[in-house]
Amino acid sequence: MSRPFGASRARILAAAAAVAVSALALAGCSSSSEPADSADAGYVTPGKLTIATGQTAYEPYVINDDPASGEGFEAALAYAIADKLGFAAEDVEWVRTSFEAAIAPGPKDFDFNIQQYTITDERKQAVDFSSPYYSAAQAVVALEGGPAEGVSDLDGLKSLVFGAMSGSTSAQTIDAVVQPDTTTQLYSSNEDAVAALKAGQIDAFVIDLPTAFLATSQYIENSFIVGQLPLGGIADEWGVVLAKDSPLTASVSAAIDELRADGTLQQITDQWLDAEQGVPILQ
């Protein structure tokens, strides 16, 4: 994962209205049957589907920090998953968690959590993951007129001071792919990394590409995307988080697989995250 901030909000809202409405409508009149014996099936609340997102949920994943609207890539996807599981929109309940708390060992107050979590073997020791629903590229964000301007390859990045959110795939990618001359500065949130960039404490930070588009278009004045980073052996596939050994893992994975097979997942992705074309990959 990387977080917060994709495409301009105005364009996103206009492009995705149909998808959001469609996802909610499908959930409201699901062809699936009502979940049977919800308590026995492992749901937190019988007859309800409890979904978690971040303490603050960011665009383009959730619009206006309101996941119940179904607007945003992960909000729309959550309702599409709910529909596949047999839940109407009104039977979906949202809760909030911090990023780290959701992947810590122990019981959960949610049935699943959708918050741009990268699937890793280390995290699998504490929680379950669904089938992946998105593969995210990592991007370098910097200020115009700063040390990163004019950089067009990996060698040009090495002399920069980088920042990233602690524990994120972005931080791992910096060290594994860029291998900068200085130690990567780690922050508790992407907001802190942005503040450090604005203060001149770092030259650039790395974040997932959809978030980079939103950051540069709305949140960081005079900023730009330097380019995408090659994978370098680090996969950044996002999965839904569930409690370890959850009885719901198989059914949630099956729902995502069905959404991929019937084209719904691609439709939602295209509507909300279609700004990723045209950014060069730095080699």
Language-model-detected regions and their locations in the chain:
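Bacterial N-terminal signal peptides that target proteins for export
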Residues: 1-16
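C-terminal motif of bacterial Sec signal peptides marking the signal peptidase cleavage site
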Residues: 23-28
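Extended ligand-binding regions for polar small-molecule ligands
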Residues: 30, 75, 80-85, 168, ...
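Extracytoplasmic small-molecule ligand-binding "clamshell" domains
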Residues: 36-113
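Periplasmic-binding protein-like
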Residues: 55, 135-142, 210, 217-257, ...
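Bilobed "Venus flytrap"/periplasmic-binding protein-like clamshell domains
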Residues: 56-58, 70-84, 118, 139-192, ...
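Acidic, polar ligand-binding/catalytic clefts
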Residues: 92-154
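A ligand-binding cleft/hinge motif common to bilobed small-molecule-binding domains
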Residues: 101, 117-126, 175-176, 198, ...
